[in-house]
Structure formats: structure tokens, C-alpha cells
Amino acid sequence: MDRLLQFRFESAPGWQSNVALFLLSIGGLFTACKLFSFCRALLSIFVLPGQKLSKFGPKGSWALVTGASDGIGKEYSLQLARAGYNILLVSRTTSKLAAVADEIKSKSPTVQTKVFAMDFFKNNDGDYENLKLLIQDLDISILVNNVGRSHSIPTPFVLTPLEELENIIMINCTGTLRITQLVAPGMMQRKRGLILTMASFAGMIPTPLLATYCGSKAFLQYWSIALGAELQPYGVQVELVQSHLVTSAMSKIRRPTVTVPIPRDLVRAVLSKIGRGSGLSAYAYTSVPYWSHGLMAYALTQVLGHMGKFVLGYNKALHESIRKRALRKAEREKNKKST
């Protein structure tokens, strides 16, 4: 018995030491992985350049931009024209498209422009057939899927008008898919091309009171990743561009801040960081090119947990507050009209 007790007493320190070493190794490996991920995000956001646009097509080839009449789409058109690409502008209102085309010609005189007016909500087969005829002889190197629609104000799902639900899904999802299906085959034949699809943090973070909009953007996230894997063997690069708020008609924000850039700065970041994941390097075929958005995406996915109750609760409270302010404003305007 004394020998048995002595054996147990002597073996304990060795057993504890092995467990401690194992736990320290696991902890060290976890810390090293987190540190590597953080450093990679910082390098991608602030230091490393993106791929050159010339990889996807020469100057003089075409870029097709949807939702091109204002905001982010207009800025893509201007900056891609400045880079030497001819621009095919697609949106709903002919007069607005013509104004953007005139601005492009004044700033980039050597660039050609074409305009094509269509209402994505109508999902008219004739519109898509006419657009197909228009692009069949064009060397389209870059497609920017920018057309989009959100809710008029944050609204509980059960109170959202049916027309608004259909509008969001038809424009954000169906329109994007049909345009891409027209353009991608030509890119595959030429063995080069770039497809940029504008997403939103709302598609990455569940957003109460914007449920349908955030669902449509989440759809684009998974669709883009799958499409990217399909088209990569053909030399076509797919990139989903994640962003937080931007000053625009859709966001109804007019004043830029550190986390809310103007469209020009966002687009400049996108075109300079092609192929860089920035704060979302764990997501294939996805980027968050604007620096503050990249840091936010990293914090949300790696620290706070973007699907957790804390972020969900904050998002819900934020949009409930926005809804209350919007309803009060609408009531004030209604009272002004009645007096």
C-alpha cells in the first residue's frame, strides 16, 4: 500500500505538467492564429495594393454599370471612364442617364458611352432581350451590379407592403442575376473579366426592421461566392463588395463621417483593392475595401460575433429609433400640408 501511494504521489506532477503543456500549446496556437488574422487584415486594409484593372480587360473595352444614374453607380461610371474604359450606363430614367453620359464625355473626352433605360422591377423580358442585342458586339470587361432597392423606412416585416417586398427582391436579386447571366458568357469566352456586386453589412448582420432587404443582400453574398468558384477557371473574377453606410439617396444620409464615406471615396477604395479581402479575408470572393468598414467587419466577425444576440439587439434598437424619427418627420410634413 505504501508503495502504491508513493507511485501515485510521484506520477501526479508529470501528469499535471503534460496537461498544462497541452493547454498552453492550444492557447498559444489560438493566440497566434488570431494575431496572424489581425495582421493580415491590417496589411490588406492599409498596405497591400489590389489587382490592376488592366488584368480584366484593356483600355477601350467596356464596363457595364447598373444603377448608374446617381450615387455609387454614377461614381463607378466616372472613375472607370477616367481609367480608360467605355461605359454602358443602365438604369431606369433616360434623362438621368443622359446627364451622366454628358458628364463622362466632358471629363473623359476619348471615352465612348451608351445608355440603356430599363426598370428592373418590371422584369420585362423584352428589356433583357434588347440589352442582349446591344452588348453582343461589345467587349465587356467589367460588370458592376450596383442597382438596388431598400425599404422606404425601417419597417417590421409583417407591416411591409407587398409591393415593397416584391420590389426589393426583383431589383436586388432577380435583376442582378439576369444581368450577370447576359454578360458572363462573353467574359468566359474571352477568358477574362471582373464582376463586382455591391452588397451591404445588412446582408452579413441580421437587421431587424430591414428583414427583406437584409435577406436579399445575404442571398447575393452566397450567390457571389458560389459564382466565383464557377467562373474562376475561365479567368473571370467575381467579387462581392461589402460596405457599411454611404452618403446616398438610399441611405438618406447627407453628411459624411469616418464610417460613412461619400460615393467617390468608396469607389476609389474598391477599384484600388480588387482581390483584397480586407476585414473579411475568411470569406471567399468578398472584400470590404473602405478602411473603416474593413476594421468594422473584422471586429464584427472576429470579436463581437456578427450573428450574436448583442449585435442583433443593437441593430434592432438602432432601426427602431430610426423608424420612430422617420414616422415623426412624416407626421410633421403631413401637418404642414394640412395647414
Swiss-Prot record:
The keyword Lipid metabolism applies. Pathway: Lipid metabolism; fatty acid biosynthesis. NADP(+) binds at L64, K105, D119, D127, N146, Y213, K217, V246, S248. PROSITE patterns: ADH_SHORT. Coiled coil: none annotated. Its EC number is 1.1.1.330. The active site is at Y213, K217. The keyword Zinc does not apply. GO terms for cellular component: endoplasmic reticulum membrane. The chain crosses the membrane at residues 19-39. Keywords: Endoplasmic reticulum, Fatty acid biosynthesis, Fatty acid metabolism, Lipid biosynthesis, Lipid metabolism, Membrane, NADP, Oxidoreductase, Transmembrane, Transmembrane helix. GO terms for molecular function: ketoreductase activity; very-long-chain 3-oxoacyl-CoA reductase activity. It catalyses: a very-long-chain (3R)-3-hydroxyacyl-CoA + NADP(+) = a very-long-chain 3-oxoacyl-CoA + NADPH + H(+). Signal peptide: none annotated. It is found in: Endoplasmic reticulum membrane. Its main location: endoplasmic reticulum. HAMAP family: 3_ketoreductase (MF_03107). Component of the microsomal membrane bound fatty acid elongation system, which produces the 26-carbon very long-chain fatty acids (VLCFA) from palmitate. Catalyzes the reduction of the 3-ketoacyl-CoA intermediate that is formed in each cycle of fatty acid elongation. VLCFAs serve as precursors for ceramide and sphingolipids. Belongs to the short-chain dehydrogenases/reductases (SDR) family. This is Very-long-chain 3-oxoacyl-CoA reductase. It comes from Ajellomyces capsulatus (strain NAm1 / WU24) (Darling's disease fungus). The lineage of its organism: Eukaryota, Fungi, Dikarya, Ascomycota, Pezizomycotina.
